[in-house]
C-alpha cells in the first residue's frame, strides 16, 4: 500500500465527516463525535509510521555441517560461540535463522553444558529447533537478511570456505547497502575464496580470527588436516590481520565486516553487529569467563595492578572463572620463551589465583619459573609447601637442591 496516498484518502474522509457534523452542531452528541474524529485523525500518522517500523532486523547465523560424534570423528561448530551470539541477537530483538552447507541437524564439538550461556541456549526450544533444522545455504535468499554471522569451530575450516552457495550469500550482502558481514574464531575462513570482480572482498579490510599461535597451543588435533592456515591465508588475500595475545578478546570492525579473534570475542562481536545495524544495544551482565578474560587483559596491559586485581577477587570471587585465569597463567609461562616480562606476568596470574585454586603441577611450574626470574625465596617457599603436602615431593626436593 502507498502509505502517503492512504493518509490523504483517510484525511479526505475525515474532512467530509467533519463537514457533515458541523451542520449538526446543535446535536447533543456533536462534541463527543468531534473529539472521537479528532483522535482518529491524530492517530492515523502514528499507525502508518508504526507499520513501516515494526519489521525486525534479520540475521542469518551459519554453522559448519562437517561435525560428527561431538568432534571425535570430525570437528564441528563451537556451541559456546553459537550460544553467546544467538543470545545477544535474541536479547536485542533480531530475528534469527540458522543455515549450514548441507542443512538439517548439525553437530557441535564437545562443550560444557554448565556454562551459563549454554544452559540458557539449551533451555531455548526455538534455538534448539533451529539447530535441528538448519536451512541449506542453497535455499537461502540473501535479500531476506540484514546481516550474516559465521560461527567458528574447527569444522568451519573444512566446509565453509568451499560452499559456493554461502559465497553467493556473502557477495549479495557485500553488494547491498546497510548490511553486516560478521564471523568469529575460525569463521573468517569463509572469506578466503570470496571474490568480486576478480578481487578478494577482504583485500584491504582489517579483520581478525584464530591466530597461528592459538592454533599451535589449542588446535593440535586437527590443524595438520586444515586446508590452509587461517591467519596466513587471510593475509595472503590482502587482509590486514589484527590480533591480541592468545585467547583474549579482540573484535575488529572494518567497513561492513565485523570479526572476532576467538571464542572469548564472541559476545562482543555479536554486539558490534547489533550496533552496526544501527540498533540501541541492550545492557547485559558479563559472563564469568568473559569477565575473567577482561581482567587478565587489564593485568597484562598493566591498566590494572595485581593488588587491584586481588581486591576485585576478594570482593566477589564467584564472578570470575578462577581455573581459567590460573591456566592462562600457565600458558603465558609456557610460551614466554624466557622473556622475563612474560614470565613475570604468568607468575602473577598463577599467584593471583593460588588462594582459590590449587594444582600441584601448576605450583611446581610456578616454583621453577621463580628460579628463572631470580626469585629464589619464592621458589623455595613453593617447593617446601609441595613437600609438606607430600605432592611431587621428589621434583620439589630436586628443585631445592638446584637452588642451593
Where are the language model's segments positioned?
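Active-site-adjacent beta-strand anchor residues
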Residues: 184, 259-260
Amino acid at each position: 500500500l502507498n502509505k502517503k496516498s492512504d493518509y490523504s484518502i483517510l484525511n479526505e474522509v475525515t474532512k467530509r465527516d467533519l463537514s457533515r457534523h458541523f451542520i449538526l452542531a446543535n446535536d447533543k452528541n456533536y462534541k463527543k463525535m468531534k473529539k472521537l474524529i479528532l483522535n482518529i485523525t491524530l492517530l492515523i500518522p502514528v499507525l502508518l509510521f508504526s507499520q513501516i517500523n515494526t519489521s525486525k532486523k534479520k540475521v542469518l547465523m551459519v554453522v559448519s555441517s562437517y561435525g560428527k560424534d561431538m568432534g571425535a570423528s570430525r570437528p564441528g561448530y563451537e556451541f559456546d560461540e553459537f550460544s553467546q551470539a544467538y543470545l545477544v541477537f535474541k536479547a536485542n530483538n533480531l530475528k534469527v535463522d540458522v543455515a549450514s552447507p548441507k542443512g538439517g541437524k548439525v553437530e557441535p564439538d564437545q562443550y560444557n553444558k554448565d556454562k551459563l550461556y549454554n544452559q540458557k541456549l539449551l533451555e531455548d526450544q526455538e534455538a534448539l529447533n533451529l539447530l535441528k533444522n538448519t536451512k541449506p545455504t542453497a535455499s537461502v535468499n540473501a535479500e531476506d537478511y540484514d546481516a550474516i554471522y559465521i560461527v567458528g569451530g574447527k569444522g568451519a575450516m573444512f566446509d565453509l570456505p568451499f560452499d559456493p552457495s554461502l559465497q553467493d550469500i556473502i557477495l549479495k550482502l557485500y553488494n547491498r547497502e546497510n548490511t553486516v558481514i560478521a564471523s568469529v574464531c575460525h569463521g573468517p575462513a569463509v572469506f578466503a575464496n570470496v571474490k568480486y570482480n576478480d578481487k578478494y572482498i577482504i583485500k584491504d579490510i582489517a579483520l581478525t580470527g584464530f591466530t597461528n599461535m592459538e592454533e599451535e597451543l589449542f588446535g593440535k588435533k586437527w590443524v595438520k588436516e586444515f586446508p590452509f592456515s587461517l591467519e596466513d591465508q587471510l593475509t595472503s588475500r590482502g587482509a590486514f590481520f589484527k590480533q591480541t595475545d592468545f585467547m583474549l578478546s579482540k573484535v575488529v570492525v572494518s567497513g561492513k565486516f565485523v570479526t572476532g579473534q576467538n571464542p572469548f570475542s564472541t559476545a562482543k562481536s555479536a554486539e558490534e553487529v547489533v550496533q552496526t545495524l544501527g540498533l540501541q544495544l541492550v545492557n547485559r551482565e558479563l559472563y564469568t569467563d568473559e569477565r575473567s578474560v577482561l581482567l587478565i587483559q587489564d593485568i597484562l596491559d598493566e591498566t590494572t595492578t595485581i593488588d587491584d586485581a586481588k581486591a576485585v577477587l576478594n570482593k566477589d570471587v564467584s564472578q570470575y572463572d578462577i581455573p581459567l585465569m590460573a591456566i592462562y597463567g600457565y600458558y603465558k609461562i609456557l610460551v614466554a620463551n624466557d622473556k622475563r616480562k612474560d614470565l613475570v606476568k604468568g607468575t602473577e596470574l598463577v599467584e593471583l589465583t593460588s588462594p582459590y585454586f590449587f594444582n600441584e603441577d601448576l605450583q611446581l611450574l610456578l616454583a621453577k619459573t621463580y628460579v628463572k626470574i631470580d626469585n629464589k625465596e619464592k621458589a623455595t617457599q613453593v617447593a617446601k609447601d609441595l613437600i609438606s603436602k607430600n605432592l611431587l615431593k621428589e621434583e620439589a626436593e630436586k628443585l631445592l637442591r638446584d637452588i642451593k
